[in-house]
């Protein structure tokens, strides 16, 4: 009887407590059912959000990549992430570039906000390297060369978000200083990070041409990594908000302001309470917007790794802007606008041609712009012709096109021997000059040489015959070193 009375009294006290909470305006459902990582101030009780933002290019003609990264930084800060947990890699030659019509300002869309202010200068200039990227992700300060020294010092309950934007090619991603990021190396770093037990889940958003090849056949499904890419393994990604397109940048700009996949996920994130939107919902929305051009432009957004993680809400990785608290995600009214786009590999041509078009006739600016157009076109012709001739010397005139352009079955990695691929690239560049951002498109040809057993000495002889001289222009110069 005493036990029954005590139980009744306890229930009565609990009821009074709940009534008091309701009277105080508390959200009982939210309080009792809130997810472990839900925290209004962005500091997760059971873990920390970390982010690495990497712009892999330099040069004003590549404005859009650093604009993407700066936009992502502002989005994460509004979402509640702290500067100490956001690591930024960007060459930082855009905001105060002499060609920038708005000195000290970077925008990511025609009517967009200024996104450069406040962005941390963690790794800039020649410190933006694949080597430092890997060290920062692994939390290994001893392996850093230059930079702020900031690394992902994460623990087992933490969530990590990585966003990369730049040019790419089959199996590679660009880096403005030092060798490129190779798919095999990147995936090994991700596996090493998982083996260290220093994160709960990791999400990787990747903007680059042939970006699907970075993870296809390489990224395990059991290391708690979910990745989406701007394109599949054998197609270009696309720049957007470009001169002459609709919508175009303000008339004083001669360069694309953003990339189609990148602005798609960020403009969606800017407009919603990310507690109500999952990674999968955003993937579907971005996929639809990025392919909207059909046969004329656009690419196929892909997903890799632990696809089961896509059920997570974006809030776990990006936080959410308190101003969007009432902007619940709904598939039918997600406020995205169609925008024309330019193939990533041709976006620099858009810039140089726009400069030439706008320069006064007979002026020094006109002559300089003409020189730049001719140099970039000459370099492209040299690279294309040289790779084609190397192929003919190795395989014969009839077989070369098929062997150089062969695409492996879906789900297969680009190449079996990644060290061989690096050797082929370095040997070619020794005799023919830098591949540069444009030449990354030929990585599949070099990979196929490895896949059929071509040796370094054969490649050396063919490259030496194909390239008697290296063109004297900045694109072909090896001043910045080899790509491998």
From Swiss-Prot:
Pfam families: Legum_prodom, Peptidase_C13
Signal peptide: 1-24
Active site: 167, 209 (nucleophile)
GO cellular component terms listed in the entry, alphabetical order: vacuole
Protein EC: 3.4.22.-
Annotated glycan sites: 326
Prodomain residues: 25-44
Molecular function (Gene Ontology), one example: cysteine-type endopeptidase activity
Keywords from the named record: Disulfide bond, Glycoprotein, Hydrolase, Protease, Signal, Thiol protease, Zymogen
Keyword presence, Disulfide bond: yes
BP terms from Gene Ontology: proteolysis involved in protein catabolic process; vacuolar protein processing
InterPro entries, per database record: AE (IPR043577), Legum_prodom (IPR048501), Legumain_prodom_sf (IPR046427), Peptidase_C13 (IPR001096)
Keyword Zinc: no
Site entry: Required for post-translational maturation and enzyme activity: 256
PANTHER family noted in UniProt: HEMOGLOBINASE FAMILY MEMBER, VACUOLAR-PROCESSING ENZYME GAMMA-ISOZYME
Function: Asparagine-specific endopeptidase. Probably involved in the degradation of phaseolin during and after germination.
Family statement: Belongs to the peptidase C13 family.
Name of the molecule in the record: Vacuolar-processing enzyme
């Amino acid at each position: 009887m005493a036990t029954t009375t005590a139980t009744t009294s306890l229930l009565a006290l609990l009821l009074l407590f709940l009534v008091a909470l309701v009277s105080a305006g508390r959200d009982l459902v939210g309080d009792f059912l809130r997810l472990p990582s839900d925290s209004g101030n962005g500091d997760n009780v059971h873990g920390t959000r970390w982010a690495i933002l990497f712009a892999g290019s330099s040069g004003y003609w590549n404005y859009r990549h650093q604009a993407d990264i700066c936009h992502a930084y502002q989005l994460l800060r509004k979402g509640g992430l702290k500067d100490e947990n956001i690591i930024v890699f960007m060459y930082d030659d855009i905001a105060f570039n002499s060609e920038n019509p708005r000195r000290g300002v970077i925008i990511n869309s025609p009517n967009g906000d200024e996104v450069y202010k406040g962005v941390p200068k963690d790794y800039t200039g020649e410190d933006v390297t694949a080597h430092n990227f890997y060290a920062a992700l692994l939390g290994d300060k001893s392996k850093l060369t230059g930079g702020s020294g900031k690394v992902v010092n994460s623990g087992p309950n933490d969530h990590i978000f990585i966003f990369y934007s730049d040019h790419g090619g089959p199996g590679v991603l660009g880096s403005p200083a030092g060798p490129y990021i190779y798919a095999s190396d990147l995936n090994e770093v991700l596996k090493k990070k998982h083996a260290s037990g220093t994160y709960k889940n990791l999400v990787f958003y990747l903007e680059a041409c042939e970006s699907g090849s970075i993870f296809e056949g390489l990224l395990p499904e059991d290391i708690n990594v979910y990745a989406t890419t701007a394109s599949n393994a054998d197609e270009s990604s696309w720049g957007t908000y470009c001169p002459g397109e609709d919508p175009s940048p303000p008339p004083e700009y001669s360069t694309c302001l953003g990339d189609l996949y990148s602005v798609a996920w960020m403009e969606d994130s800017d407009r919603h309470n990310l507690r109500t939107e999952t990674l999968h919902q955003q993937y579907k929305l971005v996929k639809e917007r990025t392919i909207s051009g059909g046969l004329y432009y656009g690419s196929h957004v892909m997903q890799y790794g632990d696809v089961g993680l896509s059920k997570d809400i974006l809030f776990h990785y990006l936080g959410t802007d308190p101003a969007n608290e009432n902007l619940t995600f709904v598939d039918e009214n997600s406020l995205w606008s169609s925008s024309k786009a330019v193939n990533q590999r041709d976006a620099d041509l858009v810039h140089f041609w726009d400069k030439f078009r706008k320069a006064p006739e007979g002026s020094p600016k006109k002559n300089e712009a003409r020189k730049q157009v001719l140099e970039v076109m000459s370099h492209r012709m040299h690279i294309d012709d040289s790779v084609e001739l190397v192929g003919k010397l190795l395989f014969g005139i009839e077989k070369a096109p098929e062997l150089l352009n062969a695409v492996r079955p879906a789900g297969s990695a680009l190449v079996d021997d990644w060290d061989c691929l690096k050797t082929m690239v370095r040997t070619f560049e020794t005799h023919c000059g830098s591949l540069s951002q444009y030449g990354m498109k030929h990585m599949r040809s070099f990979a196929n040489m490895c896949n059929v057993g071509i040796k370094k000495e054969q490649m050396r002889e063919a490259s030496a015959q194909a390239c008697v001289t290296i063109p004297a222009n900045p694109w072909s110069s090896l001043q910045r070193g080899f790509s491998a």
